[in-house]
């Protein structure tokens, strides 16, 4: 099973927000939203939106919003 994880990470590397789901289209849409919601100032200071995959719910960060 592929699980898609969307993360917003602050300049110090801390996870600011995280949403996980099994639907690739939903994950891509979420990632686009995460990217659009970062301001130019945030991006310049090192904020990033990251989309990655894992194979198990055990690999999803504990504070993630998990969508089935």
Which role fits each region the language model picked out?
Residues 11, 24, 54-57:
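Generic structural motif
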Residues 6-8, 31, 35:
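Polar/charged side chains located within well-ordered beta-strands of beta-rich proteins
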């Amino acid at each position: 099973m592929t699980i898609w994880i969307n993360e917003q990470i602050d300049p110090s590397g801390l996870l600011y927000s995280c949403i996980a789901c099994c639907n690739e289209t939903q994950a891509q849409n979420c990632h686009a939203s995460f990217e659009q919601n970062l301001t130019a100032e945030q991006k310049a200071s090192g904020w990033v939106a990251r989309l990655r995959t894992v194979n198990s719910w055990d690999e999803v960060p504990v504070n993630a919003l998990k969508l089935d």
